[in-house]
Amino acid sequence: MHLSPNDSNQYRYLTLSNGLRVLLIHSDTAQQSAAALAVNVGHFDDPVDRQGLAHYLEHMLFLGTEKYPKVGEFQSYISQHGGTNNAWTGTEHTCFFFDVTPSAFENALDRFSQFFTAPLFNEEALDKERQAVDSEYKLKLNDDSRRLYQVNKEVINPEHPFSKFSVGNLDTLGDRDGQSIRDEIVEFHHSQYSADLMTLTLFGPQSLDEQQAWVEAMFADIPNHQLSGKSINVPIGTEDSTGILVQIEPIKEFRKLILTFPMPGMDKHYGVKPLSYFAHLLGYEGEGSLMLQLKSKGWITSLSAGGGASGSNYRDFTVSCTLTPEGVDHVDDIIQAVFQYLTMIKQDGMNEWRYLEKQAVLESAFRFQEPSRPLDLVSHLVINMQHYQPHDIIYGDYKMSGYDEDLQRSLLQYLSVDNVRVTLIAKGLEYNRTAEWYFTPYSVTPFSSEQKRFFQQIDPRWQFVLPEKNPYICYDLDPMPFENGGSLPELIEDLEGFRLWHLQDDEFRVPKGVVYVAIDSSHAVASPKNIVKTRLCVEMFLDSLAKETYQAEIAGMGYNMYAHQGGVTLTLSGFSQKLPQLLEMILRRFAAREFNPTRFETIKQQLLRNWRNSSQDRPISQLFNALTGLLQPNNPPFATLAEALEEIEVDELSTFVESILAELHVEMFVYGDWQRQQAHDMATTLKDALRVKEQRYEEALRPLIMLGQNGSFQREVHCNQQDSAVVIYHQCEDIEPRSIALYSLANHLMSATFFHEIRTKQQLGYMVGTGNMPLNRHPGIVLYVQSPNAAPAELVTSIDEFLNAFYMVLLELNDYQWHSSKRGLWNQIATPDTTLRGRAQRLWVAIGNKDTEFNQREKVLAELKKLTRADMIRFVVNELKPRTANRLVMHSQGQAHIDAPRIHLGQEIGSIEEFQLRPKDCGLG
């Protein structure tokens, strides 16, 4: 097996007697164990009259087995032992995965293995979970991506299984005359879930021999029906599915143009990755690129290439553009430009050195590969096992074995006018069809011969240029020598308006680094209008950088700038050798900043559209946005931002930036394999660009509205959607480690029980959960439900009943369950950083939180260790019981429940401005 020299794991690949392929992974340092099983069965395998059956089966396997019959037992066991679990159903595969504390791994595996040998398919659970599947379907009825996907299913070959309805609902999964859904799901599981279609991956600190013994004992009984090598013999396309324009009406306000080129399946070419070559050239964003020239015309705002649906016998290659309103009127011109660029590639762009550049980038990424989270690792590799040869399971994603011009040119033939399907997504077009299941309006029109001739013309207005050699690619990479230093960040510059933190990494020893720069300014967040100006400036700056930074991103470096409650933060990450060069270039662009009126108008309209579109988001998302906007004055809700943006003009921005520069406070963190002097050098570059001298400006305050001892507050948000939703937030008044431990443990203990009670048992909705929700360093806990079945008043009643009874759940836990739950949370909090970037982020958060001793985590763990069951019961009764709790209830009454009784509890929040006059905690960071 081809492994990275940076990979310290031990691997063993084997095939069980029943044909199940297994990958075992041992790590000496693993703090968590994980497993994933994938089966080569998906919605393509659904019976035509039972569409959604594979998805329904995926749900049912979690709900009881012969050995462990209790519904929800698996999830409770995993949750109590510090783990998580999930699954997904795709076109041709279904994947199940979980992680858990290592001491519970054997028992968790035993429960997991029963899914595939002896599921119960309990009648009551079948009926309730069918409701959950139906709720999941209804949840996505207004989801544009799902609505567009359905149209794609209708314009390809109707005989191909891609055309099937994948989710299922009450209609497709109900009992019928003479047809019991239970009989059919049992038969589907028995006939389709064959061991020779399965792959299994385990990860943990257990030895490979121990893991192998478990696997052989638990998974060898899965039956083998000799199904390996199954294939799809129906082509995905017909003559009518290319050479057409498909117009689709979205729900949200956006415009997109997608050119789709159907191709044969590409699995056999994974070791060459021929399509990535074309994706890079078409997606290039530098001078002379397709994107830049279309952008300069004011027709598009972004362009990407290479993505698209893929399966065992098909692969779509797409070129996708986000259009401006003017771009909708120039669709044929944009298509013509794409084909002219493709002609240039055919004539001048077939060069081995371009392939070798991409190969070098992937080889560096593989060589200095950093560990993934155990759950991410097993769920990724178990799918790789379905596609790659055993020796390439780890390496296959990075493998580029050599330039094959004959193969490249053969694939270029598919990128033709006769083999394209163009999809235009925009409002206000002509539609004469309605898609099944999601009711999407659309139309299909064949291109005329005149249009096809136009698409193939060479137009002199396009001055396209292919990318030059990439100056950012690093061919000779090794970590820099390690200077003697501590293991924690050190403050190496401490000026009035500037602080520089530095740490040279001594653990991961990879030639990578991360730079954070927080630019705080009270002026940047002084009003909603200033907050919007700050975001506008950030978006315009990022827009101006794209053409110069694209090559750096291709070479394994990344950057971002984002606005927050105190100002803006700039981050850079990637290979350290040339990251200072990227920082210097970004700062040079900042010094020469200009606010182009045309780009300003485009970006302004883009932001307006995004913020207005939020009114079409799921009700639960709108409630969370309204909640944070209510409690964090420096983080207004989207509607407030959109209103403020309407008034802003381009000529206001230059003086606005100058006023920020006149009173800013900068904090910088340089972490990676850079030595101290290099950190000073980067800081000097930064201070020169931002004109940082000896200013005496402080960091901006981040106010948080405190609920105080006032019982329940409630506010209704009008979402104009079918579903109702409720979010209940409990706020902690202090930021002490003990409080963090209490809120974290409460959430950890109640999450699985709440899910089981509200979703599995009561079937109130598909989106159900609890979560930690710290705001401005204050711990908080949130409970939420979005429901097609119940109005907010009923949802709040159900949540309150759960909270009122939860202390009984705690009393009924035996000592083993109590200590296992604490240990599970302990392991989650104490999990060591697995990547350099992950550690950088944790240390940066500590710097922002003024945890300058970097020991907040240890303090929380110490408090967690001390917590008793009596402490937790006291906390639940005193802080979470609805009658006495200080909380904020956000709710939205769906159209389906418009006549249901309204919520009447606590103090209703009418005016946001008045509510925000309440006492605030104005902290830093």
Which role does the model predict for each range below?
Residues 1-15, 233, 485-492:
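Short, Gly/Pro- and small/polar-rich lid/capping loops
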Residues 10-26:
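Mature N-terminal segment immediately following signal peptide/propeptide cleavage
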Residues 25, 30-43, 53-54, 71-115, ...:
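M16 family metallopeptidases and their MPP-like homologs
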Residues 124, 130-138, 143-197, 201-216, ...:
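Hydrophobic, small-residue-rich alpha-helical packing segments that form membrane-like cores
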Residues 138, 227-287, 375-393, 398, ...:
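His/Glu-based metal-binding/catalytic segments typifying zinc-dependent metallopeptidases
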Residues 184-217, 650-686, 885:
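Non-catalytic, conformational "gating/processing" segments within enzyme and secreted inhibitor domains
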Residues 212-228, 682-696:
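Glycine-centered hinge/linker elements that transmit conformational signals in sensory
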Residues 411-414, 418-484, 631-642, 655-717, ...:
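Long, compositionally biased intrinsically disordered regions
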